[in-house]
Every structure is written in C-alpha cells, then in structure tokens.
UniProtKB/Swiss-Prot annotation:
Subcellular location: Cytoplasm
Superkingdom of the organism of origin: Bacteria
Function: Single strand-specific metallo-endoribonuclease involved in late-stage 70S ribosome quality control and in maturation of the 3' terminus of the 16S rRNA.
Organism phylogeny: Bacteria, Pseudomonadati, Pseudomonadota, Alphaproteobacteria, Hyphomicrobiales
Identification of the protein by name: Endoribonuclease YbeY
Group of enzyme by EC: hydrolase
GO molecular function terms noted in the UniProt entry: metalloendopeptidase activity; RNA endonuclease activity; zinc ion binding
Naturally occurring in which organism (per UniProt): Bradyrhizobium diazoefficiens (strain JCM 10833 / BCRC 13528 / IAM 13628 / NBRC 14792 / USDA 110)
PROSITE patterns (alphabetical): UPF0054
Recorded family membership: Belongs to the endoribonuclease YbeY family.
PANTHER family in the record: ENDORIBONUCLEASE YBEY, CHLOROPLASTIC
Keyword annotations of the record: Cytoplasm, Endonuclease, Hydrolase, Metal-binding, Nuclease, Ribosome biogenesis, rRNA processing, Zinc
One BP term from GO: rRNA processing
Amino acid sequence: MGADASAFSFRTKTMSHPNLPMTEVLVVADCWQREPDSEAVIQRAVAAAAESVDEDVAEAEVAVMLTDDAGIRTLNSNWRGIDKPTNVLSFPALQPEGEWKEGDAPRMLGDIAIAYETMRREADEEKKPFDHHLSHLAVHGFLHLIGYDHENDDDAEEMEALETQILAHLGIPDPYADRPGTH
C-alpha cells in the first residue's frame, strides 16, 4: 500500500456472536493510530448492518482493511481503473455454487478497504463526527458485499434508505439529510 506493510503494527479483532459475521479489522497505515476506537466502531457498524438485512450472514467472515490514501489509490487503480483515492472500496467474495451448511468452513463475504485521509477530510468538510462517518462507510461497504449497489437512482435510493435505517439504530443521524435531491 502506501509503504512497506511490515512497518506497521497489525491489530485484529473479531466478533463471535453466532448470528453475526466474524469481522477482522486489519490496520495497515499508521495514520489510523490517531483514532484508537476505529476498530470498535467498525465492529459495531458491521454488526448493526448484519442484524438489519435479510441475508444469512451468520458464521460468515468480513475483512476490513484500514489503509491510507496511497493504499486505496493503488487498489482503486488496479481494480477499477480509477487512479485516485476514494473513501471506501468493497470487494465481494465470489462464492462457489451450492448451499453453505453449518460446520462448513466460514464463508467469506469479502473485503472492505477504508482510506483514512479521504474519510477524515469528508467528515471535517461535512462537519460530521469521525466515528459517525466511519460507521457510515463500514455499513456502506458491508451492503456492497451482500449485493447492494448504487448504479442507478432506484438502487441508490434503496441502499441509502437502508444505510440511514442502520445508522439510526446506532444513534447516528441521516448522512444524506443535508444533501439536496436525496430521499
């Protein structure tokens, strides 16, 4: 990513509630050390999203990488052909055909990458608490992993409404309320 990954301290946490996905958070950029509660914020946001959808995500796995603008720019360039940083990227896992059964190895929902500098700048510009914006991006990324998108207006409206509902459950105001032309 932005630098040699071996230079950073890697920390992980997982959720072990049986009806929620196991969420691993991997910190690969030093800038995230300024926000020591980021891992807990992400765990809580992913859990709230998982509880709010009809998808069976019990015993599934999600990986969240906390990176910097340089790292996410590389991912964005390599995977989307867009050579600039973005706030969040989601990489849904391709699942083999067939049903997952209890006792099988955990199924991977996919990976989410969140860039510190872009996310911090957006939160500051929109005058939102850092943890609220981080929660929003974690929820947004999770919804992409389970098939939601915003490629057209109807899909965007559906996804934004679900994000708003999930965030309200966390006590976070509607992130789209101040944007003209939304729901």
